[in-house]
C-alpha cells in the first residue's frame, strides 16, 4: 500500500503523462478542434470588444484629450489578457465537453489496444460530436450543480470570524477535488459509471485524486500551458483510470 505522499506524487504525475499522448494520430483532432473553436471565440469577443471600446472612446473623449487613448488602449489590452487567462479554461470546458468523451475513448484505445466503436473520417467525426453533445452538456450541468452546492457554503464561511482564515486553503483543496471529478468523469462516464459511483472510486483513492487535481489546478495558473490543460487533463485522467481504477 502506497503512502499518502506517494499517492499525491503519483496522482500529480498522471497529468503530465497525458501530455505526450495528445499528438498521436486519432487523438490529435479531439485536441485541435475544441482549442480552435475556443480560440476563435475569444478572438471574436476581443475584436468586437475593441470595436465597442473604440466607439466608446470616440463618444467620451474630446479631440483635445485624444492623447488619453495611448493610456487607455494598453489598459484594455491588459484587461483582455486577464479575461482570456481566467476564463479560457472555464469556457473551454463547456466548448470541449462534446469532444472530451471521444478524446478519453481514443486515449483509452491507444493505451489498451481495444479500438472504440467511433466513426472514422471527418464526416464520422462530426457525427460522433453531434451524438455526444447532449449527454456531454447534461454531464457538465450535473458537475456544475455539484460544485455550486458545495462552493456556496464554503464561500459563506468567509463571513465567519476565525474560520475565514482557513477558507483559502479549504477552497484550494476543494478546487483540486473538483478538477479530479471534472476530468475523471470522461473516462469513467464512457464505462457507464454513474456520477455517485465515480465519486466513490475517486474517494477510495483520495490522495491520488487530490494529487491529480492539484497539478491540474497549478497548470491552469501558468500562461500558455493553460491553453492545453483541458486535453492534457482528460488524457491524464484516462491513463489514471486505466492503471488505477479500471481493475476495481
List each language-model region with its residue ranges.
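Nonpolar helix-loop interface/hinge motif
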Residues: 9-22, 166-212, 227
Amino acid at each position: 500500500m502506497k503512502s499518502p505522499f506517494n499517492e499525491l506524487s503519483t496522482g500529480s504525475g498522471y497529468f503530465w503523462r497525458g501530455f505526450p499522448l495528445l499528438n498521436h494520430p486519432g487523438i490529435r483532432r479531439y485536441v485541435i478542434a475544441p482549442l480552435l473553436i475556443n480560440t476563435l471565440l475569444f478572438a471574436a469577443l476581443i475584436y468586437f470588444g475593441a470595436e465597442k471600446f473604440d466607439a466608446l472612446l470616440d463618444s467620451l473623449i474630446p479631440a483635445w484629450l485624444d492623447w488619453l487613448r495611448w493610456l487607455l488602449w494598453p489598459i484594455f489590452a491588459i484587461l483582455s489578457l486577464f479575461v482570456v487567462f481566467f476564463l479560457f479554461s472555464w469556457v473551454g470546458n463547456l466548448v470541449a465537453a462534446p469532444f472530451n468523451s471521444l478524446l478519453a475513448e481514443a486515449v483509452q484505445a491507444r493505451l489498451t489496444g481495444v479500438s472504440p466503436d467511433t466513426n472514422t473520417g471527418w464526416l464520422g467525426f462530426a457525427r460522433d460530436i453531434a451524438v455526444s453533445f447532449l449527454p456531454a452538456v447534461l454531464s457538465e450541468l450535473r458537475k456544475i450543480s455539484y460544485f455550486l452546492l458545495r462552493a456556496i457554503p464554503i464561500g459563506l464561511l468567509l463571513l465567519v470570524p476565525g474560520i475565514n482564515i482557513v477558507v483559502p486553503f479549504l477552497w484550494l483543496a476543494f478546487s483540486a477535488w473538483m478538477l479530479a471529478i471534472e476530468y475523471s468523469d470522461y473516462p469513467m462516464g464512457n464505462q457507464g459509471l454513474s456520477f455517485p459511483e465515480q465519486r466513490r472510486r475517486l474517494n477510495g483513492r483520495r490522495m491520488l485524486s487530490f494529487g491529480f487535481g492539484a497539478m491540474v489546478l497549478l497548470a491552469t495558473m501558468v500562461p500558455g500551458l493553460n491553453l492545453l490543460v483541458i486535453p492534457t487533463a482528460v488524457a491524464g485522467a484516462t491513463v489514471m483510470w486505466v492503471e488505477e481504477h479500471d481493475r476495481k
